[in-house]
């Protein structure tokens, strides 16, 4: 049997920079809770065997928070095992995937709940690129992430918030999600980082600590992360054509 692919969405954070009285992933965007869009994108992909949504232990099911009708037809399993950090939530989510039958050689695609612009086409592009990364030995494929080349000129500030230097943007990419790795390799990478007290801001950072070099796969500016209050207006514009289009479109 070929290796399967699972999605994992850590959803236990508070999103304080985005403002609002509820976590940003629960705030409305174009008539739907933000988290709906990621769940819809993965649900529309036949390549994904199952999706695990990792919530905080004291959270409530999405169906109780918003009503069951909103999530009707979406394929996902909820795990109330989220930790204090993304690192901890992903690690707990990997253990939950094992309970769903995921093996160490299966793939996991970890996605930010606050990236509602994800489409099935982006997911398929990532899967195709990662699984064909080593045609001579498919089992040796390391993994990869969606990302976009940095288009702007970057400035490094000095202590006085003045320009200290200009950072060459050649070869710089802005990491996005999903980030796709073998379940066992990612679990080991996260456990090693935790044991070393290392700060890893995404899954690829943990993989890099093992001396591995994940593949960069072209993503989309549409797949940006909603971080600040003003980002909601942009998300509304991108997704305002309707929830069905946001789930099915590759734009």
From Swiss-Prot:
InterPro entries given in the database record: IspD, IspD/TarI, IspD/TarI_cytidylyltransf_bact, ISPD_synthase_CS, Nucleotide-diphossugar_trans
GO biological process: isopentenyl diphosphate biosynthetic process, methylerythritol 4-phosphate pathway
Pfam families: IspD (PF01128)
EC nos: 2.7.7.60
Pathway listed: Isoprenoid biosynthesis; isopentenyl diphosphate biosynthesis via DXP pathway; isopentenyl diphosphate from 1-deoxy-D-xylulose 5-phosphate: step 2/6
Catalyzed reaction equations: 2-C-methyl-D-erythritol 4-phosphate + CTP + H(+) = 4-CDP-2-C-methyl-D-erythritol + diphosphate
UniProt keyword list: Isoprene biosynthesis, Nucleotidyltransferase, Transferase
Residues under site feature: Transition state stabilizer: 17, 24
Keyword Cytoplasm: no
GO MF annotations in UniProt: 2-C-methyl-D-erythritol 4-phosphate cytidylyltransferase activity
Superkingdom classification of source: Bacteria
Site (Positions MEP for the nucleophilic attack): 169, 225
Family: Belongs to the IspD/TarI cytidylyltransferase family. IspD subfamily.
Function noted in UniProt: Catalyzes the formation of 4-diphosphocytidyl-2-C-methyl-D-erythritol from CTP and 2-C-methyl-D-erythritol 4-phosphate (MEP).
Name used for this protein in its record: 2-C-methyl-D-erythritol 4-phosphate cytidylyltransferase
Organism: Cupriavidus pinatubonensis (strain JMP 134 / LMG 1197)
Gene: ispD
């Amino acid at each position: 049997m070929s290796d399967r692919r699972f999605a994992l969405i850590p959803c236990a954070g508070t999103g304080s920079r985005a403002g609002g009285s509820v976590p940003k992933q629960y705030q409305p965007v174009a008539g739907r809770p933000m988290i709906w869009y990621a769940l819809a994108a993965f649900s529309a992909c036949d390549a994904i065997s199952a999706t695990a949504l990792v919530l905080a232990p004291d959270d409530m099911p999405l169906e109780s928070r918003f009503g069951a009708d909103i999530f009707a037809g979406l394929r996902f399993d909820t795990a109330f095992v989220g930790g204090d950090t993304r690192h901890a939530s992903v690690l707990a989510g990997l253990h939950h995937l094992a309970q769903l039958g995921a093996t160490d050689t299966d793939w996991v695609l970890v996605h930010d709940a606050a990236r509602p612009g994800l489409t099935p086409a982006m997911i398929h592009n990532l899967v195709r690129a990662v699984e064909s990364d080593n045609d001579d030995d498919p089992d040796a494929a390391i993994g990869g992430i969606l990302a976009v080349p940095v288009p702007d000129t970057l400035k490094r500030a000095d202590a006085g918030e003045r320009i200290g230097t200009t950072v060459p943007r050649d070869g710089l990419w802005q990491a996005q999600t999903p980030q796709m790795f073998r379940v066992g390799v990612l679990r080991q990478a996260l456990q090693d980082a935790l044991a070393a007290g290392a700060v890893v801001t995404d899954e690829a950072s943990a993989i890099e600590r093992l001396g591995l070099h994940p593949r960069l796969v072209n993503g989309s500016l549409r797949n940006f992360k909603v971080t600040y209050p003003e980002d909601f207006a942009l998300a509304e514009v991108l997704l305002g054509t309707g929830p069905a289009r946001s789930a099915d479109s590759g734009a």
